[in-house]
Amino acid sequence: MSIAFIGAGNLATNLAKALYRKGFRIVQVYSRTKESAQGLAQTVEAAYTTELQAVTKEAQLYIVSLKDAAFVELLPQIVSGKENALWVHTAGSIPMNIWQGHVARYGVLYPMQTFSKQREVDFGQIPCFVESNSEEDVQLLKDIASALSEKVYEASSEQRKSLHLAAVFTCNFTNHMYVLAAELLKKYGLPFEAMLPLIDETARKVHELEPLAAQTGPAVR
């Protein structure tokens, strides 16, 4: 299957690399910046472009991984002339029906994880949630996701919205607390590394205990 990526950010970079390693053919990468487009394209042996009108019309699957606002704004331009291919986005918070009226075949491929370009992740353990407007494409997306991960689920847009919100609490807000802790420690000349055993144990606990049962310290009170 030939795949084109619209976007070359943190998620797109990790997903494209994972698909490439599993033998999928990435034919092109689009990003508005040459550095991002070319960097990812070279890694997965693909062409690249920084112009939406130059995005290939020959791919069988288009994976859109852009910031939410940019995706909504650029959607008509992105799909122009390529309406008969399968289109998916990777966002947790955007409903599947955003595609409706723009393309015939569409869906969502949502790997629920925190991604950074500079850090490789083990896709085998990442939960992947799929959705499509046809049963045939649901199965196709499940097959693609299953090539990467042992944990593949079908989830509706409403379910995925809740997953995304839960992930924000679990990851983004938690990491922001680390930022605040690091700033406090720095102010008093203490290393953030002193927090790492505490961070690790806190994370390990919820593998064995319900989050409420694992809560200790001032937060209990």
For each of these PLM feature ranges, what is it?
Residues 1, 24-28, 58-62, 82-87, ...:
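Short active-site oxyanion
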Residues 1-49:
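NAD(P)+-binding Rossmann beta1-loop-alpha1 motif at the extreme N-terminus of oxidoreductases
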Residues 24-25, 104, 150, 190:
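Short phosphate-binding/catalytic loops that engage adenosine nucleotides
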Residues 34, 44-120:
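Rossmann-like NAD(P)(H) cofactor-binding subdomain of soluble oxidoreductases
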Residues 36, 40-43, 120-165, 170-207:
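Internal alpha-helical scaffold of NAD(P)-dependent oxidoreductase catalytic cores
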